[in-house]
Amino acid sequence: MASEGDPGVGSGDSDFVVVANRLPIDMERLPDGSTSFKRSPGGLVTALEPLLRKRHGAWIGWAGIPDSAEDPIEDDGLQLYPVSLSADDVADYYEGFSNATLWPLYHDLIVKPIYHRKWWDRYVEVNRRFAEATARAAAEGATVWVQDYQLQLVPKMLRMLRPDLTIGFFLHIPFPPVELFMQMPWRTEIIEGLLGADLVGFHLPGGAQNFLYLARRLTGANTSRATVGVRSRFGEVQVGFRTVKVGAFPISIDSDELDGKARNRAVRQRAREIRNELGNPRKILLGVDRLDYTKGINVRLEALSELLEDGRVDSHDTVFVQLATPSRERVQSYIEMREDIERQVGHINGEFGDVGHPIVHYLHRPIPRDELIAFFVAADVMLVTPLRDGMNLVAKEYVACRSDLGGALVLSEFTGAAAELRQAYLANPHHLEGVKDAIEAALNQDPEEGRRRMRALRRQVLAHDVDRWARAFLDALADTRAGAKPVRD
């Protein structure tokens, strides 16, 4: 064990520690210089909150504003440990390496990744700070769960500081094909960073298989050759005397909560009001996305434009609502993408709309949760058309909100969700005619066929919720090390 004062000292009392880029709070700096915060909703914190409470748990992460204090925060019984990031850290580690290098590389090079040594150096430095904060907070023999692409070096760094810990890592975005990942100048360092964990989890078996191959190729480690299955049949990598398990764990949503909220009388009344406000169209198409170039918003707009032009969709009884949450607004590729999307919206409304009757209703702002659920209830067709997406929880949220068995889901084949939601209208977003055909089929589906499809989709989503995902991962993590404490509430 490290000496007194070293980051490796296990002085903390938390038996279960979650490490993520962001804390589960939204913090803002007030005019007088002080700060305030509120809890940010999310499936991850919902799933893990009971475990965090039961096990004296802690959450390590950035509070969301530069140069915030690192004083621990207690929020309704949860212990939060902020990691302070400077404006330069945010620019280089987060906006730079995480979102201009890793994000496009892991999403099939939709936008060209940028490789800067300065960004990489800052990524290493910030990951080390997260590892040191975790080492201080974790009790002897604790379980640590590291989340996502911003922190891929933390497992190895933490292993060096605290070999007594049981460490899991889960990647929430796709893991790229081997030939794409090999472009990364620091490819070996990232693979070795992840191999510091006892369990490395991905959404789909394909990502796990890619990782196993790269571990073998880049580190020379012995790996299992068997096919990885969903929540079963784990791959293995031998790292010295340790065996690292590699598995597939498709993430999900709090489907029971959404199902209950969508049945609420006020929400259903709001859904009727939305239809009235849109002019009581025969069909409402809906898109709900963070404004990101991976989401394929431009694809659905182009498909709709051509369907209107071909007369396959009637402009007088169909509207499309696109809810786009602002994202990464200082990054040039996102600025250009927003301009392109707004240009497409203007073209469609100018070409096919009438005064007082636009075809596309485009909202570029955050939408309150209950309002979003009302949109899900109101929409006849949900359009989820990413060019690449690790899972896409919006597709599952829409299904969870349709207890009436109404509606239809058009879903990109290049989402992780497509592997589970087979009764959706699946489409290749790179094939515009295929997207158009899927939208047309969803708009004109036979009502009984629609109910059959939605019933099957709901069975899948309600049975495989976020709690089941978290338990599957944590049970597998506890099995990796003899004597590890099981994480149970």
From Swiss-Prot:
The keyword Signal does not apply. It comes from the Bacteria. Pathway: Glycan biosynthesis; trehalose biosynthesis. SUPFAM superfamilies: UDP-Glycosyltransferase/glycogen phosphorylase. Signal peptide: none annotated. D-glucose 6-phosphate binds at residues 22, 94, 148, 328. GO terms for molecular function: alpha,alpha-trehalose-phosphate synthase (GDP-forming) activity; alpha,alpha-trehalose-phosphate synthase (UDP-forming) activity; trehalose-phosphatase activity. One of its GO terms (cellular component) is cytosol. GO terms for biological process: trehalose biosynthetic process. It catalyses: ADP-alpha-D-glucose + D-glucose 6-phosphate = alpha,alpha-trehalose 6-phosphate + ADP + H(+); CDP-alpha-D-glucose + D-glucose 6-phosphate = alpha,alpha-trehalose 6-phosphate + CDP + H(+); GDP-alpha-D-glucose + D-glucose 6-phosphate = alpha,alpha-trehalose 6-phosphate + GDP + H(+); TDP-alpha-D-glucose + D-glucose 6-phosphate = 5-methyl-UDP + alpha,alpha-trehalose 6-phosphate + H(+). Keywords: Glycosyltransferase, Transferase. It holds the Pfam family Glyco_transf_20. Its EC number is 2.4.1.15, 2.4.1.347. UDP-alpha-D-glucose binds at residues 42-43, 290, 295, 393-397. This is Trehalose-6-phosphate synthase. It comes from Mycobacterium sp. (strain KMS).
